[in-house]
Amino acid sequence: MTSLSTDFTEKLFADYEANAKYGAIENAVTHNGLLKSIETRQSEVENDFVFSIDLTKDEVSNQKASGRCWMFAALNTFRHKLISDFKLESFELSQAHTFFWDKYEKSNWFLEQIIATADQEIGSRKVKFLLDTPQQDGGQWDMVVSLFEKYGVVPKSVYPESVASSNSRELNQYLNKLLRQDAQILRDLIASGADQAAVQAKKEEFLQEIFNYLAMTLGLPPRQFDFAYRDKDDNYRSEKGITPRAFFEKYVGLKLSDYVSVINAPTADKPYGKSYTVEMLGNVVGAPSVRYINLPMDRFKELAIAQMKAGESVWFGSDVGQVSDRQKGILATNVYDFTASMDINWTQDKAGRLDYSESLMTHAMVLTGVDLDADGKPIKWKIENSWGDKVGQKGYFVASDAWMDEYTYQIVVRKDFLTAEELAAYEADPQVLAPWDPMGSLASK
């Protein structure tokens, strides 16, 4: 190993002081902050909020201090359809309802994984992976589908937000504390030679305690409820004693098995045209596993555009924190100019960023529009976020096409937009990725 010599460091001082530009940038950044000092005017000019395809201007939702973006994005795609179909002024489905059942199911999932890995050393990478975060707020499209199909949905008015759903830190802290304690008891019980029946009985005791904890922090979810509304024509409608699953079937009415997840992960370990799943990723035990098909970016974008041309918004996952201005709602590769200001060049490509842990899926949102040029190619994309209406343009964001290429990783589209060859590849036995693969990272946030 080579240490840093005094002579080398003195040379760096001299080189810095010889460049007047660095001094000017130093003054700007130390007074105004890094990104504000190097933000480009051009990125704002190029990325206005006018789109040739624009599906909705509905009010945005707000996940607040929680990691429920994947739920919000899915429920937002449903509510746009519901607002249109039933002629409503506005409407929101309960994210807290889905959140409750996800926490309940994830707790069971974790305990089952602990039982399945009881023969491994406590220091094994998989056991450590489980214990590092027994459960969290994040998730994947297939996981939210499992929740909707098992538990349905309810209007937000029926099961509103709580302090714990809007700010989940305390809820997660003590739920994970409880789950780690349960994990130790189960591993010790198995090590003592207890049979499967005894282990499952103990797990069920834990789940009663967990259910009680969730009900007391989030509120007991309804098994049936009454629902009434007036449409835009002032017609009154009501439902009495409807269940969450019946509400989903009647008011959402989508066959979720008709949708597939498409990823763009251009790394050597994930050839295009193949299906993939992620080990130990899920929430509902017994539900279909998370599955993706990996396709080139041009095809990936073709599918998203085709679905929006058909009038349907697109759930998608990206690395939203990369080169973005949250307040203005601009996601663009040229939003900050590190090259002209600081002589820093970003040369790492999308595959390199994935391989070297510089980028991963961090946030799910909804594509609700796109601006196409004369040849039908995308220029910029309209995004419905779930960070409230105080950021972006009343909560909507815009992404340049170059940003989409570099930092978008997943979309959910209808099966009938895939070719027969693509559908066959999706339905083939998937390659199993490691639990810590970046294509599973949206569920670890």
From Swiss-Prot:
Question: Could you say which EC number(s) this protein's record lists?
Answer: 3.4.22.40
Catalytic activity line of the entry: Inactivates bleomycin B2 (a cytotoxic glycometallopeptide) by hydrolysis of a carboxyamide bond of beta-aminoalanine, but also shows general aminopeptidase activity. The specificity varies somewhat with source, but amino acid arylamides of Met, Leu and Ala are preferred
Q: Which residues form the active site?
A: C69, H363, N385
BP terms from Gene Ontology: homocysteine catabolic process; proteolysis; response to toxic substance
Keyword list (alphabetical) reads: Aminopeptidase, Hydrolase, Protease, Thiol protease
Quote one Gene Ontology molecular function term: cysteine-type endopeptidase activity
UniProt subunit comment: Homohexamer.
Which family is annotated?
Belongs to the peptidase C1 family.
Record-given protein name: Aminopeptidase C
Organism, as annotated: Streptococcus thermophilus
